[in-house]
């Protein structure tokens, strides 16, 4: 739900469009700071690569009015996914609000996906 393609992409979108801050040098300085303090790089945080490598069935959910993660990103994630996948774009829904938009439909859609692709009776009985 609300998946983004890469740290760089989400920084570029939020900093340049919402905050009016340049991606360079802020992204590179932030990346350097994380490497020094935490020992990891933003380049290693790539949902796009992770989705491409994952062989499990995947359900992509996104609101078409997402103000934080552009809906175009879920289309790129969906295209990167090899194998079984499903894309659900909710009309008029903002960031993180897919469940709140209609909890019953959301739960049913996720349940249907899980029942179709996975065998997990303990979860499905609840």
Task: Go through each PLM region and give its residues.
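Catalytic metal-binding/acid-base residues of hydrolase active sites
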Residues: 4, 65-66, 94
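Catalytic active-site module of serine/aspartate enzymes centered on a nucleophile-bearing elbow/loop
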Residues: 100-126
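Short, well-ordered secondary-structure micro-motifs
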Residues: 9-12, 71-72, 100
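Catalytic histidine neighborhood in serine/cysteine hydrolases
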Residues: 75-98, 103, 109
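Conserved alpha/beta-hydrolase "acid-adjacent" motif
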Residues: 43, 67-73, 98
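Short alpha-helix in the alpha/beta-hydrolase fold that links the catalytic acid
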Residues: 47, 56, 70-79
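Short beta-strand/loop motif that positions the catalytic acidic residue
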Residues: 53-55, 59-62, 66
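Hydrolase active-site cap/lid region
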Residues: 1-43, 49
């Amino acid at each position: 739900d609300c998946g983004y393609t890469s740290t760089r992409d989400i920084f570029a979108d939020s900093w340049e469009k919402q905050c009016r801050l340049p991606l360079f040098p802020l992204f590179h300085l932030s990346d350097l700071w994380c490497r020094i303090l935490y020992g990891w790089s933003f380049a290693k945080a790539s949902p796009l690569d992770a989705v491409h490598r994952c062989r499990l069935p995947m359900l992509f959910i996104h609101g078409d009015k997402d103000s934080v993660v552009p809906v175009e990103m879920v289309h790129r994630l969906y295209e990167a996914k090899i194998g079984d996948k499903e894309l659900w774009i909710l009309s008029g829904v903002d960031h993180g609000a897919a469940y709140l938009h209609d909890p019953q439909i959301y739960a049913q859609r996720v349940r249907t996906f899980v029942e179709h692709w996975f065998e997990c009776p303990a979860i499905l009985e609840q």
